[in-house]
Curated annotation (Swiss-Prot):
Protein's UniProt keywords contain Ubl conjugation: no
Listed EC numbers: 2.3.1.97
Cited PANTHER family: GLYCYLPEPTIDE N-TETRADECANOYLTRANSFERASE, N-MYRISTOYL TRANSFERASE
Protein name (Swiss-Prot/TrEMBL): Glycylpeptide N-tetradecanoyltransferase
Cellular component terms per the entry's GO annotation: cytosol
Length: 491
């Protein structure tokens, strides 16, 4: 082979690596407001200086403040009763996400504008089922699903959503809005609609006497409470190499990659099975107890929430991958006591592959919530009871994640690796190509051993009208196998 052949090979490797990086950015959510210029505009806009969020000082740190609300106390009577003013030619539209036509409009807007790469090679493929699952949690308010339309054509050109959640930040629990899917049509970025959308959803949330919110972004805004890093686990090497997601390493072969990322044919933990409705009370108690270990976490105050997030998206029919399935939730039932000892779950968010002669969809799974009782004191008796499941919450919460002794930490690491290994088998059998996870929860306990590779994206967590000390997102603790302090999974 002559020098020109070597150069061609090197150029091809560089091209494939850059293409893979583009897809990594999609999966990492780095371009989550459309193009890079639109994201930059939101981050630099003077709008944030007017909002009750911790401000970044000249040194790059936020100004010290006491933990708690930033704004002075208010009531809904203090809130403007009319919607904010839009630029000429646009109008507000409350979106009924249960209406098939309106949910399709949101789907099209998000797919074409929410996340994209520069070459238009990959796009998130939001399904109606995913949007229903994400936006209709118990207690949701249709008024918090806000669109902007062109007055003349009624075309939907912008969207933002909120759902009610109860959130705990260290010792304080309060109602909040989870804000998501802020999207402006890429041709209208110069209209500065994003700040107007944020103000409007804030106004509507405040009218319900809720004054705090949680949200995430791949860009730096004032001011992150914590940051997580994305990791990716290859499940389908031939396809990922073919579409440019995973360049073939020099000296390696597809066959070697297949062997490297192979998984067993069936789960290995005794009692590992799909979650059922009758599991909800036990799962809820176990999950709440587990999440008490983190500095920020969703409270999951009642079983309706648990049933929605882990069962409502299970799809139709039985066996294998179901029609319209969005979430996969599995538990471990003790064969002797019939206690639920573990929960683990993931959700699906595929990406459309544009302009590829063979493949049109990248099936991506994302780690969702999990919990295990191996870190808790054993129950007082072998008989199943809710009291046993709830026992010891305060003592574990006092220790906190990362505060367990070495023996308990090792038990947690071993159990999470076993649970994740079984979940990867389920994902592989369901036809997923890649499995994604952040460094939140205790994910660092298993990422390395389960062959997750680091992405180049980071997800920043934010609280609106709430100041708190920084919370560890685990992005620096992957090799140390140290859990994070973030216990909220944002879609």
């Amino acid at each position: 082979m002559d020098s020109s052949d070597n150069k061609a090979a090197t150029d091809e490797e560089i091209r494939r690596a850059l293409k893979a990086a583009d897809l990594m950015k999609i999966l990492d959510g780095k371009m989550a407001l459309g193009n890079k210029s639109g994201t930059k505009n939101l981050g630099e806009h003077k709008f944030w200086k007017t909002q009750p969020v911790p401000q970044i000082t000249g040194s790059g740190a936020s100004a010290p403040m006491e933990e708690g609300p930033i704004d002075d106390p208010k009531t809904p009577a203090d809130v403007k009763q009319e919607p904010g003013v839009l630029p000429a030619g646009f109008e507000w539209s409350t979106i009924d996400i249960n209406d098939e036509e309106q949910s399709k409009e949101v789907y099209v807007l998000l797919c074409e504008n929410y996340v994209e790469d520069d070459d238009a090679m990959f796009r998130f493929n939001y399904s109606r089922e995913f949007l229903l699952w994400a936006l209709t949690a118990p207690g949701y308010l249709p008024d918090w699903h806000i669109g902007v339309r062109v007055q003349k054509t009624k075309k939907l050109v912008a969207f933002i959503s909120g759902i009610k959640i109860d959130i705990r930040v260290r010792a304080k629990t309060f109602p909040a809005a989870e804000i998501n899917f802020l999207c402006v049509h890429k041709k209208l970025r110069s209209k500065r609609l994003a700040p107007v959308l944020i103000k409007e959803v804030t106004r509507r949330v405040n009218l319900t006497n809720i004054w705090q919110a949680i949200y995430t972004a791949g860009v730096i805004l004032p001011t992150p409470i914590g940051t997580c890093r994305y990791f990716h686990r290859n499940l389908n090497p031939p396809k990922l190499v073919d579409i440019g997601f995973s360049p073939l390493p020099r000296g390696s072969t597809i066959a070697r990659l297949v062997q490297q990322y192979s998984v067993p044919s069936h789960p290995r933990i005794p009692g590992f099975r799909e979650m059922k409705k009758e599991d909800v009370p036990q799962v809820g108690a176990l999950l709440r107890r587990y999440l008490d270990r983190f500095d920020v976490a969703q409270a999951f105050k009642d079983d309706d929430e648990v049933e929605h997030w882990f069962l409502s998206g299970q799809g139709k029919e039985v066996g294998g991958r179901r029609v319209e399935q969005v979430v996969w939730a599995y538990v471990v039932e003790d064969p002797t006591t019939h206690r639920i000892t573990d929960l683990i779950s993931f959700y699906a968010l595929p990406s459309t592959i544009m302009k590829h002669p063979k493949h049109n969809l990248l099936n991506a799974a994302y780690m969702f919530y999990y919990a295990t009782d191996v870190i808790f004191p054993p129950p007082s008796s072998s008989a199943h009871s809710d009291a046993d499941v709830n026992a010891g919450e305060s003592s574990v919460a006092a220790v906190g994640t990362g505060g367990e002794d070495a023996k308990t930490k090792k038990k947690l690491e071993t159990r999470l690796n076993a649970l994740t290994a079984d979940l990867l088998i389920i994902a592989k059998q369901a036809g997923f190509d890649v499995f994604n996870a952040l460094t939140l929860l205790d994910n660092n306990m298993f990422l390395q051993e389960q062959k997750f590779g680091p992405g180049d994206g980071y997800l920043n967590y934010y609280l609106y009208n709430w100041n708190c000390a920084p919370i560890d997102g685990g992005q620096h603790s992957t090799t140390a196998k140290q859990g994070s302090k973030i216990g909220v999974v944002m879609l």
